[in-house]
Design a protein with these regions (language model features):
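Conserved ABC ATPase signature
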Residues: 139-147
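Conserved ABC ATPase "signature" region
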Residues: 118-135
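Conserved ABC transporter NBD signature motif
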Residues: 61-71
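Helix-to-loop junction immediately C-terminal to a conserved catalytic motif
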Residues: 53
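ABC ATPase C-loop
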Residues: 156-157
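Q-loop/switch helix immediately C-terminal to the Walker
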Residues: 91, 97-110, 122
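ABC ATPase NBD coupling module
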Residues: 69-86
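ABC-type ATPase nucleotide-binding domains, specifically the catalytic core motifs of the NBD
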Residues: 15, 105-118, 129
Length: 228
């Protein structure tokens, strides 16, 4: 069985908007595996998720999704593959001139044949699960950061995917978010997805509330695995 995600000797030079580059990064995740990655609090913006989702080609090494090197995929194949990934972005990741509701449901509506009402009902349930009263209809610029983070979590778990890239999903949202977030991660793992959870919180890194296959620590551009 091919790993869901495999990074092999990945190197990315440092450049803005990131706080650091990557050097010799290698790890793989099988279906149903979770990796938590501890980031330095002073350098939380890393290109790791962009590389893992095929948005940033590494200068050296390979990034493979379900056995296919992102660098060898054509635009259509990469788009189809990326539809099987979900993400909570370190930055906002919103289309500015679209309501949060449209942002939240756009990918699922575009990449599946599900009825819009079905998608909207699931989105509403997820928003409530993550502590919002309903699917927000505000512009992203009109919402508070904690509520946007909750909406990002709802968007990430709308529908199903093979790979979840969660960049500090708990950031600015308070401890009440964690039970719902951990439950959704456990559900994704149970369906055979792989999850990468990046965090600056040592407590979350050690115990994200879900079985953890790998604990990784990013120090500058270097990624090291912590042994039990």
């Amino acid at each position: 069985m091919e790993p869901v995600l495999a990074l092999e000797g990945v190197a990315v030079p440092w450049e803005l908007p990131y706080d650091t580059g990557l050097s010799g990064v290698s790890f793989a995740l099988e279906p149903g595996e979770l990796a938590t990655v501890l980031l330095e609090a002073s350098h939380p913006l890393t290109p790791l998720a962009d590389v893992a989702s095929g948005l940033l080609p590494p200068e050296q090494g390979r990034a493979r999704f379900k056995g296919r090197d992102w660098a060898h995929m054509g635009p259509d194949e990469a788009c189809t593959a990326r539809a099987r990934t979900r993400r909570v972005f370190a930055a906002q990741g919103w289309i500015d001139r679209m309501g949060v509701d449209g942002n939240l449901m756009l990918a699922e509506a575009h990449h599946t044949r599900r009825r819009l009402r079905e998608i909207a009902d699931e989105a509403r349930g997820l928003c409530r699960e993550f502590g919002l009263p309903d699917v927000p209809r505000d512009w992203p610029s009109e919402m508070r950061e904690p509520d946007l983070r909750r909406a990002q979590c709802a968007r990430a778990f709308l529908g199903e995917a093979d790979l979840y890239l969660l960049e500090r999903p708990e950031y600015a949202s308070g401890p009440d978010l964690m039970p719902a977030l951990s439950a959704r991660v456990r559900g994704a793992l149970g369906r055979g997805a792989a999850v990468v959870w990046l965090t600056t919180e040592p407590g979350v890194w050690r115990d994200p509330g879900a079985p953890t296959a790998r604990r990784l620590r990013l120090s500058g551009p270097l990624l090291a695995e912590e042994t039990p």
